[in-house]
Design a protein with these regions (language model features):
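Single conserved hydrophobic/aromatic residue that forms the stacking wall/gate
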Residues: 1-12
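Charge-patterned, long linear interaction tracts outside catalytic cores
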Residues: 209-216
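Intrinsically disordered, low-complexity regions enriched in small/polar residues
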Residues: 3-4, 100, 110, 208
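Extended, charge-rich helix/loop segments that form flexible
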Residues: 203-209
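Second-shell loop/turn segments in exported
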Residues: 15-22
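A glycine-rich helix N-cap at a beta->alpha junction
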Residues: 23-27
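Second-shell residues forming the walls of enzyme active-site clefts
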Residues: 28-184, 188-201
């Protein structure tokens, strides 16, 4: 995956993790990356929906609130996701809260994940939560609540990283929780990317190149 939103300041905002400042340039460069990944048999995941470039806080460490108008977010941040919605295998929503749109961070917001991503953008791929162990997610509730909220909001998969005990709690919390459209999720999982035929790949050429490098 690779962030599709322009970045403004430090941490994610002013790093080399975004392609460009212009959303149309981001979309075109993203299209090229998706094409290359698809050729290699790798699904592309766009993040962080709907955009992470309007805040300076690091959501790993703190709450992040984007107070911009919805129209600006849609025109700038969401545009690359809209252009690439049919070619992305997955999308990862952010833990940013967009105050003019919803009271919940995007990862826990049906308004973002269902109304906008699924319905308006017609995204048919998989939705992966961002790490539910991040500080901005912890403010929503305990890990059990976070897990259920993320699934109810529209996440197909939830991530709980770097904390095995929380991962166990998350699994237990959803063991009897109704997971909607399980069969559809599995179908999407195995059909969101066209696996290439390896009959005419350049693997022999690559192996020969590696052999030459190793021999020098």
């Amino acid at each position: 995956h690779y962030p599709l939103r322009r970045q403004r300041q430090m941490c994610i905002r002013d790093s080399d993790r975004a392609f460009h400042k212009d959303p149309l340039a981001i979309a075109e460069l993203g299209r090229c990356l998706v094409r290359g990944l698809t050729y290699a048999g790798v699904g592309a995941v766009g993040k962080h929906f709907p955009g992470h470039g309007g805040v300076i806080e690091d959501t790993h460490l703190d709450e992040a609130i984007d107070n911009r108008e919805v129209a600006e977010i849609m025109a700038q941040d969401v545009l690359p996701f809209k252009v690439l919605s049919s070619s992305l295998s997955g999308v990862m929503p952010s833990h940013v809260r967009y105050s003019k749109f919803d009271t919940q961070p995007a990862c826990f917001s049906r308004q973002w994940l269902i109304d906008i991503l699924r319905n308006d953008l017609n995204f048919q791929g998989l939705v992966f939560s961002d790490d539910l162990s991040m500080r901005a997610a912890e403010l929503v509730g305990d890990v059990a609540s976070r897990s259920r909220l993320a699934i109810d909001a529209g996440c197909d998969f939830i991530l709980v990283c770097n904390n095995s005990e929380d991962a166990d709690r998350a699994l237990r919390s959803i063991s009897d929780h109704r997971l909607n459209n399980d069969q559809q999720i599995m179908k999407k999982m195995f059909s969101t990317i066209d696996m290439p035929s390896f009959v005419n790949t350049r693997s022999d050429e690559y192996k020969a190149s590696l052999s030459r490098i190793e021999s020098t």
